[in-house]
Amino acid sequence: MLRPSRTFLIDGSNAVYAVFGPWPETLKEQNRCAWDFISALNEWTLGTSEFSIELVFDGFYRAIPEVNRQKLRVIFSDEAKADSIILERIRSLIYFKEKVTLVTRDQDLAQEARRENAKILDPQKFWSMISRPL
């Protein structure tokens, strides 16, 4: 199966925070925000072959909603930093000639990603894209 030529790599907690505001105090509410974000991403991926999405969260695995695994990959960093995994994925994807857009507001991460030839997109702008039909 051919991979799409564009990958949106999303700095998970950073993007969810940018879209939904400060993280709630309880894990249950944090998970609800993440689930809402993942569900919207999944809905957006249905019916298109133009891109894939990789969503990277800090921390250990948590239950997530069912997703279209051919188009949406959810990664938990475990003990590593999400930023390190994101940069590793950018380098790998660029090496294989894919176009990469990083969705983040983290300016340090964005600067490093630009050095690797990734494009940067603000999470609010990305949310506006996925909130309307393709």
Segment roles from a protein language model:
Residues 2-8, 14-134:
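Nuclease catalytic cores that cleave nucleic-acid phosphodiester bonds
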